[in-house]
Amino acid sequence: MTEYKKVIAQNKKALFNYFIAERLEAGIVLKGSEVRSLRQGKASIEESHAADTGHEVFLYNCHIAEYEKANRFNHATRRPRKLLLHTKEIKKIIGRIRIKGYTLVALSMYFNKKNKVKVELGIAKGKKLHDKRESIKEKDWKRDQSRLIRQK
């Protein structure tokens, strides 16, 4: 059974810049105008990351455009947004992030089958320059392979 996901935004740079050690799903606290803007697909999580503040985890630098029809009741576009996780998950995340070199990045934002906005997070470790070059070579080689197979 495939799970329904209507993807709002993806962070493709994160997959290039980081090794993803673990993926997890979190809910997010939003205002009404933010949800309406997300339904129009006006969001960007390219530079966003998550960090802990004691017993809570917040998503920083996530851009959700202002909703045109909300006029004076609009939201701040880059405000920190609280992520909804169980306390066991938060403790596990904090333990992994405290290890040197690991960070928590947003990989995608989507609506699930119950029309709730979810954020896919990844516990990630940064790639070095030579690792990035290696992944570029791999990607090019796979592209060339598929071209050769199509030509035959």
Curated annotation (Swiss-Prot):
Give GO terms: molecular function aspect only: RNA binding
Could you name the Gene Ontology cellular component terms for this entry?
cytosol
Pfam families the record matches: SmpB
Checking Gene3D superfamilies in the record gives: 2.40.280.10
Question: Is Calcium one of the keywords?
Answer: no
Keyword line: Cytoplasm, RNA-binding
Name the Gene Ontology biological process terms.
trans-translation
What compartments host this protein? Answer: Cytoplasm
Q: Which InterPro entries match?
A: SmpB, SsrA-bd_prot
State the family named in the UniProt similarity comment for this chain.
Belongs to the SmpB family.
Q: Which NCBIfam families match?
A: PRK05422.1, smpB
- What PANTHER family has UniProt attached to this entry? SSRA-BINDING PROTEIN, TMRNA-BINDING COMPONENT OF TRANS-TRANSLATION TAGGING COMPLEX
Job of this protein: Required for rescue of stalled ribosomes mediated by trans-translation. Binds to transfer-messenger RNA (tmRNA), required for stable association of tmRNA with ribosomes. tmRNA and SmpB together mimic tRNA shape, replacing the anticodon stem-loop with SmpB. tmRNA is encoded by the ssrA gene; the 2 termini fold to resemble tRNA(Ala) and it encodes a 'tag peptide', a short internal open reading frame. During trans-translation Ala-aminoacylated tmRNA acts like a tRNA, entering the A-site of stalled ribosomes, displacing the stalled mRNA.
Instruction: Supply the name of the protein.
Output: SsrA-binding protein
